[in-house]
């Protein structure tokens, strides 16, 4: 229904952003809302209009490729919008695609809500069908350019990041395990989320 929404970021929360377009605020659920910052600069968010009997929502993405992977994930039995967002929030799209192509169930089950059965279904449904999802279209989440000076981070950003992890479906015990590592750094909310997800997907669970 909507290809994209262009406007200004009015609100950023753990699960969604609000984009103001001509005086109308669009609530858009995104994989990691904190990649969007409130500013007077106009942005474009590529959207997916999700409609079911009990829900109608807009999901938003920074690129068409990210949205494409989201729609492909929704086509897998056992994966709903929240699960698909949690997978995309990791920012490790290339690894997700590689895991599917190499039938790496151990990697896939690290995502919240993905058990062995769902991981197998992802492989069965998507293997060989992700050539149009280009990993290079996604921002490198851990590039040196994104590192913040230590003086710029604060506990407020970390608190927001932890809240976002819980919203993605990670259990409190999982969140608690990555906190010591996160406390060693001083990052933006977005970077804390990406760092935490990297730790969770690489064994800190």
Swiss-Prot record:
GO biological process, one term: DNA repair
MF terms in GO: ATP binding; four-way junction DNA binding; four-way junction helicase activity
Endpoints of the signal sequence: none
A GO cellular-component term linked to this record: Holliday junction helicase complex
CDD domains to which the protein is assigned, alphabetical: UBA_RuvA_C
Spans annotated as Flexible linker: 142-152
Protein's cellular compartments: Cytoplasm
Chain positions covered by the region annotation Domain II: 63-141
UniProt function note: The RuvA-RuvB-RuvC complex processes Holliday junction (HJ) DNA during genetic recombination and DNA repair, while the RuvA-RuvB complex plays an important role in the rescue of blocked DNA replication forks via replication fork reversal (RFR). RuvA specifically binds to HJ cruciform DNA, conferring on it an open structure. The RuvB hexamer acts as an ATP-dependent pump, pulling dsDNA into and through the RuvAB complex. HJ branch migration allows RuvC to scan DNA until it finds its consensus sequence, where it cleaves and resolves the cruciform DNA.
Membership in a protein family: Belongs to the RuvA family.
Identification of the protein by name: Holliday junction branch migration complex subunit RuvA
Taxonomic source organism: Bacillus anthracis
Chain's gene name: ruvA
């Amino acid at each position: 229904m909507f290809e994209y929404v262009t406007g200004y970021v009015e609100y950023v929360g753990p699960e969604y952003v609000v984009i103001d377009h001509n005086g109308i605020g669009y609530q858009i659920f995104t994989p990691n809302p904190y990649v969007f910052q409130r500013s007077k600069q106009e942005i474009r968010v590529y959207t997916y209009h999700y409609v079911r009997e009990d829900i109608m929502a807009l999901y938003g993405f920074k690129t068409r490729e990210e949205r494409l992977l989201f729609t492909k994930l929704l086509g897998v039995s056992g994966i709903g919008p929240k699960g698909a967002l949690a997978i995309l929030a990791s920012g490790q799209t290339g690894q997700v695609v590689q895991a599917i192509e190499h039938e790496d169930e151990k990697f896939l089950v690290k995502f919240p809500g993905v058990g062995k059965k769902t991981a197998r279904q992802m492989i069965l449904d998507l293997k060989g069908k992700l050539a149009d999802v280009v990993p290079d279209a996604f921002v490198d989440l851990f590039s040196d350019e994104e590192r913040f000076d230590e003086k710029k981070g604060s506990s407020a950003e970390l608190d927001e990041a932890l809240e976002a992890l819980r919203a993605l479906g990670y259990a409190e015990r999982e969140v608690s395990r990555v906190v010591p590592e996160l406390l060693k750094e001083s990052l933006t909310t977005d970077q804390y989320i990406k760092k935490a997800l990297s730790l969770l997907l690489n064994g800190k669970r």
